[in-house]
């Protein structure tokens, strides 16, 4: 019986050592991933900024990613150009309002 306990203890030690090595590798990969996400977060376009040249580069808001909203602008010369900005669509605003109201009621 004592031999079985020694073998089990040895197996548990080996498994915990090998899994800790795997966790260290995983943490290093996660750190690199977080650094990459931070870099893309810095490169995204904030709310109310122009996104005419990069319509899919808007940052994330509290709940949703901002959408590039475009409008046609007529210059003084009579030329029409498209101008876009990152903003929150009305249906996202409504959803955020409902969620905020629900948080106030239910804590």
Swiss-Prot record:
This is U1-lycotoxin-Ls1n. Residues 21-41 form a propeptide. It is found in: Secreted. Residues 1-20 form the signal peptide. Its main location: secreted. It comes from the Eukaryota. The keyword Iron does not apply. Expressed by the venom gland. One of its GO terms (molecular function) is toxin activity. GO terms for cellular component: extracellular region. The presence of a 'disulfide through disulfide knot' structurally defines this protein as a knottin. InterPro entries: Spider_toxin_CSTX_knottin, Spider_toxin_CSTX_Knottin_CS. Keywords: Disulfide bond, Knottin, Secreted, Signal, Toxin. Belongs to the neurotoxin 19 (CSTX) family. 04 (U1-Lctx) subfamily. It holds the Pfam family Toxin_35. It comes from Lycosa singoriensis. Disulfide bonds join 44-59, 51-68, 58-86, 70-84.
């Amino acid at each position: 019986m004592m031999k079985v306990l020694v073998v089990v203890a040895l197996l548990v030690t080996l498994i915990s050592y090998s899994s800790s090595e795997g966790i260290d590798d995983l943490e290093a990969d996660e750190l690199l991933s977080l650094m990459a996400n931070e870099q893309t977060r810095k490169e995204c376009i904030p709310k109310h900024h122009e996104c005419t040249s990069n319509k899919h580069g808007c940052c994330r808001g509290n709940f949703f990613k901002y959408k590039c909203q475009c409008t046609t602008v007529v210059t003084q010369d009579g030329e029409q150009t498209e101008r876009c900005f990152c903003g929150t669509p009305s249906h996202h605003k409504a959803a955020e309002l409902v969620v905020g109201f629900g948080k106030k009621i239910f804590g």
